[in-house]
């Protein structure tokens, strides 16, 4: 992989030729089109294909992947210009592998998605995701799940090999995280039991891989109650082979003040859950 800084007179074609790449690949990898004008000083990622395959009549993504002992998911990842589409055209040129790109390690990638996300955008990112998390299942104070139209997202995630996480939050239909709903649930053992039973039923019915717990604006005095609730979820779900992730607000210190932060005790929640997701976008 190269980082090319655009100079006067550079074009996508000349840059691609300089690095033994293809203009269409350079454009797609940098969020450009072949007609996008370049700007002097602009930095572009350029990847040099090691092996190329030109699509012939009758070939499919699956057959090509099989010929090179690759998964369809890997082939899609290596050809971002496809944007997740599986329909190939005769003459399409695919990168089978790239030069000088040894694996650096492993990385788990999760993305939240609203049920109304556009299909083209969803399909373009799914090959790169480890997990897809439809947003969100809210709760009532009595421990009843608010429904979520997640069927399309779950179907697409399964098609592209991404595991699905069920997202549990205190978000209300009005779009606000409810401190009141969180407090009512965390102080009501019967409501927690009802919610846990419904979560297990929903996950089994819809094929969810795990659970992401995202309670925000929890009253500070319920810090330990929240951690105990997450622990209770983990124990029940782990028994079914399902992990529990706790979403944490970003903090600069354990003493950080504010309703968003104080009940998110990093030490307690990291022990209560199987993993944590640090919401640095907050």
Question: What name fits each language-model region?
Answer:
Residues 1-20, 42-69, 92:
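Primarily a LysM-type cell-wall glycan-binding module
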Residues 2, 34, 51, 83-84:
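Short, conserved secondary-structure segments in the cores of folded domains
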Residues 4-7, 43-45, 54-56, 93-95, ...:
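Soluble periplasmic/extracytoplasmic beta-strand elements of cell-envelope proteins
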Residues 20-30, 71-79:
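Short, structured beta-strand/loop micro-motifs enriched in basic residues and often containing a Trp
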Residues 30-49, 87-100:
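Short, structured interface segments
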Residues 60, 71-131, 197, 239:
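Non-catalytic accessory regions flanking glycosidase/transglycosidase catalytic cores in CAZymes
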Residues 102-115, 126, 140-282:
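Chitinase-like catalytic core of GlcNAc-active glycosidases
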């Amino acid at each position: 992989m190269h980082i090319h800084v655009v100079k006067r007179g550079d074009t996508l074609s000349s840059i691609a030729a300089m690095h033994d790449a293809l203009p269409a690949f350079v454009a797609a990898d940098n969020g450009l089109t072949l007609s996008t004008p370049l700007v002097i000083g602009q930095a572009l990622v350029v990847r040099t294909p090691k092996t190329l395959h030109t699509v012939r009549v009758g070939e499919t993504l699956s057959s090509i992947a099989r010929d090179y002992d690759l998964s369809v998911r890997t082939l899609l990842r290596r050809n971002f210009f496809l944007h997740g589409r599986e329909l190939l055209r005769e003459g399409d040129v695919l990168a089978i592998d790239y030069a000088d790109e040894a694996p650096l390690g492993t990385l788990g990638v999760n993305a939240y998605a609203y049920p109304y996300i556009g299909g083209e955008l969803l399909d373009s990112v799914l090959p790169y995701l480890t997990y897809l998390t439809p947003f969100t299942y809210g709760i009532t104070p009595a421990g009843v799940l608010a429904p979520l139209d997640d069927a399309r997202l779950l179907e697409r995630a399964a098609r592209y090999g991404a595991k699905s996480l069920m997202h549990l939050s205190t978000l209300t239909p009005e779009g606000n995280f409810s401190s009141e709903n969180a407090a009512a649930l965390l102080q009501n053992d019967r409501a927690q039991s009802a919610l846990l039973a419904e979560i297990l039923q929903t996950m089994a019915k819809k094929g969810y891989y795990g659970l992401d717990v995202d309670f925000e604006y929890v009253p500070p005095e319920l810090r330990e109650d929240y951690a105990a609730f997450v622990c209770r979820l983990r124990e029940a779900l782990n028994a079914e082979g399902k992990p529990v992730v706790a979403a944490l607000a970003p903090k600069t210190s354990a003493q950080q003040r504010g309703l968003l932060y104080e009940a998110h005790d990093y030490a307690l929640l990291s022990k209560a859950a199987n993993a944590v997701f640090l919401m640095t976008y907050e």
